[in-house]
């Protein structure tokens, strides 16, 4: 479980250098992070350490992370955002 201060740092890390990533990652954090289990939360935090071009490639479905935790988290993020569109 993360403290409020840690969650504030995680939220700040959700702010990316690419607007396209901001509109995908931030809503997922705000709406889903607390419902993730501890491992998924760690995977999400670890995913935020990846470079923007890699994240963009994975989110757009043009590639897949070799890290299984990252790949699963990207799948969750994409599914969450698709559910909001439909």
Curated annotation (Swiss-Prot):
GO cellular component terms, A-Z:
cytoplasm
InterPro entries in alphabetical order:
SDH, SDH_sf, SdhE_FAD_assembly_factor
Q: List the disulfide bonds.
A: none
A Pfam family in this protein?
Answer: Sdh5
Q: Does Transmembrane count among this protein's keywords?
A: no
Question: Which keywords does this chain's UniProt record carry?
Answer: Chaperone, Cytoplasm
Location comes to: Cytoplasm
User: Alphabetically, which GO biological process terms does the record hold?
Assistant: succinate metabolic process
Q: Name the family the entry cites.
A: Belongs to the SdhE FAD assembly factor family.
* Protein task: An FAD assembly protein, which accelerates covalent attachment of the cofactor into other proteins. Plays an essential role in the assembly of succinate dehydrogenase (SDH, respiratory complex II), an enzyme complex that is a component of both the tricarboxylic acid cycle and the electron transport chain, and which couples the oxidation of succinate to fumarate with the reduction of ubiquinone (coenzyme Q) to ubiquinol. Required for flavinylation (covalent attachment of FAD) of the flavoprotein subunit SdhA of SDH and other flavinylated proteins as well.
Q: What is this protein called?
A: FAD assembly factor SdhE
